[in-house]
Amino acid sequence: TAVVTLHSAALWTDSRYFIAAEKELQGTEFRLMRERIDGTPTIAQWLGQELAADDWKEVGTDGMCLPQSEAAAMKEELKRNGGLSLRTNLDILDRIWSGRPGVPHAKVSIQPMEYAGETCSSKLGRIRHELLRLGATAMIAARLDDIAWTLNLRGTDVHCTPVFVAWLVIGQDNAVLFIDDEKLTPEVSAYLRHEGVAVKPYGSIADYLRTCNEYAMLIDPDTVNSRLAQVRGHYNTVTAPSPIAAMKAVKNPTEREGFRNAMIRDGVAMTRFLKWLDEAV
């Protein structure tokens, strides 16, 4: 996490990137803050120390990149450290970063039933049942792996992870996937129509939420970002963990067989490597 004030700048990162960050920050104004190391201040503590008495006491961040739970915790900590306030609708990088990469446009593919073991419509039905049990009638699915699992779709937007950039809103009578059209092949579009999933532009989710009426919308503060959590349509909110994570954790027979087959292939690859290493040394 990078933090910039009028007079200083700092970067917080964990131990995986200490060496790389130290190298990259040489010759810059940024100080390296090693997370989870004794003596390293939190962002709020550092800001409370760094901001001069005559500085503006407002901290800006892009709420689209900050989970609601983290935003709430940071807001309280900033208040304790210097009486600072938090603004979550600020994306300065978008204003100054010319040529900033956009959302990836790689095509989405369908996960075959021979690997999924359960249809999308069946998963949506189970999710809707869980929502009612939790006192909700709809939910925002924000985790990319939750969306991919629910819809039996896969993508390549994140390196080494079969997910795609999207949002998903699930209601009792409908489901809406927010994704750029160019990512969908004719086959995937037809598949989504068959499964009862409507498609809207990726950037239109906030406008859509403002039109939602008479919903009890489940919002998981650990997965839904601060900006979306603060959008207010004509609906009540239910704060609770997303039911999808627990459902996804219980593997069906087809998924368990896939795990076994993957472990066999992985074991063969490891054995071949160890054999080569033993003979080469």
Question: Where do the model's predicted regions map?
Answer:
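A composition/biophysics-driven feature that prefers long, compositionally simple stretches
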Residues: T1-A280
